[in-house]
């Protein structure tokens, strides 16, 4: 009788072990999903944005400009290491996630060679002709790691829907004067463009950057298309990867924030 109870107990133990093994993943997906991150606590957000509360339109835009203009500025060479932190793959700390392709790639594989990643200015640096100078040219809130070839294809094009598929970067499309990023980062792109329009208002010796509703802006300090960007912002709200990025920039590098990640409703309040 005791031997029978032991056999039953052993069978239960083996079954439990099998269930436990089945519940533990043996590998990680090659395309990492966003992981939870600590957003700015409500009390801290209230303090940071206190002077902007209750405002709309140009008054809100001006108040946010005053707030986010208080920042630490990086050199262009410092951006390499910073992007390794801001865009770190949450499942592999040795890698970054490339903006347009979504590929996870070694932090050390950056430069100008085919297959490397480089520093993409989401607000194209020729739109306002600020180049890579400290300021808009080195602002982490719109700099992202991207594949060298895909970055070249995007060039300084405005953002819009449509075009032909970009080889090697599924979900991205381009034509002669515009670029459409993959769905998972459309809102990210929109919020980066709108951050730049609030942060750089013709002060500090740089152009007044503004969104408009056209493509082919060239070297003018405008970026399109605002109607499409607002649609992308609505359809792709901030996820945990984007919120974590905002935290890293604020806490470890620039000490300023992208308000449209923290308060998405402010896009409609201004535009």
Annotate each language-model stretch with its function.
Residues 22, 90-91, 111, 252:
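A generic structural signal for short, solvent-exposed coil/turn residues
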Residues 1-32:
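Secretory targeting and sorting signals
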Residues 112-271:
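Domain-level detector of nuclease and nuclease-like folds
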Residues 96-98, 102-116:
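Short, His- and charge-rich active-site/binding loops that engage polyanionic ligands
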Residues 57-61, 104-111, 229:
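A broad, low-specificity signal for short, low-complexity segments enriched in glycine/proline
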Residues 5-10, 53-56, 101, 110-111:
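Feature targets compositionally biased, intrinsically disordered low-complexity regions
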Residues 10, 14-15, 88, 172-175:
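Intrinsically disordered, low-complexity, compositionally biased regions/tails
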Residues 28-102, 266-271:
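N-terminal module-boundary/linker segments of secreted carbohydrate-active enzymes
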């Amino acid at each position: 009788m005791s031997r029978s109870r032991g056999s039953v107990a052993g069978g239960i133990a083996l079954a439990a072990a099998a269930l436990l093994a089945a519940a533990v993943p043996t590998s990680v997906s090659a395309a990492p999903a966003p992981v939870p991150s600590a957003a700015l606590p409500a009390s801290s957000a209230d303090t940071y944005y206190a002077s902007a509360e209750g405002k709309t339109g140009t008054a809100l835009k001006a108040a946010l400009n005053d707030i986010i203009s208080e920042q630490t500025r990086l050199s262009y060479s410092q951006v390499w290491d910073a992007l390794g932190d801001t865009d770190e793959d949450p499942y592999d700390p040795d890698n970054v996630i490339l903006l347009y392709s979504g590929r996870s790639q070694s932090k050390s594989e950056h430069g100008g060679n085919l297959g490397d990643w480089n520093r993409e200015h989401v607000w194209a640096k020729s739109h306002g002709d600020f180049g890579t100078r400290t300021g808009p040219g080195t602002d982490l809130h719109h700099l992202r790691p991207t594949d060298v070839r895909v970055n070249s294809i995007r060039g300084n094009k405005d953002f819009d829907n449509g075009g032909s598929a970009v080889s090697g970067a599924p979900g991205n499309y381009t034509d002669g004067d515009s670029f459409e990023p993959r769905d998972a980062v459309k809102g990210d792109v929109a919020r980066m463009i709108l951050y730049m329009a609030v942060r750089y208002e013709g002060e500090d010796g740089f152009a007044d950057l503004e969104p408009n509703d056209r493509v082919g802006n060239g070297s003018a300090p405008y970026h399109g298309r605002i109607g499409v960007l607002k649609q992308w912002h609505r359809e792709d709200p901030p996820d945990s990867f984007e919120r974590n990025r905002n935290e890293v920039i604020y806490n470890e590098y620039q000490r300023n924030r992208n308000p449209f990640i923290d308060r998405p409703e402010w896009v409609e309040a201004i535009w």
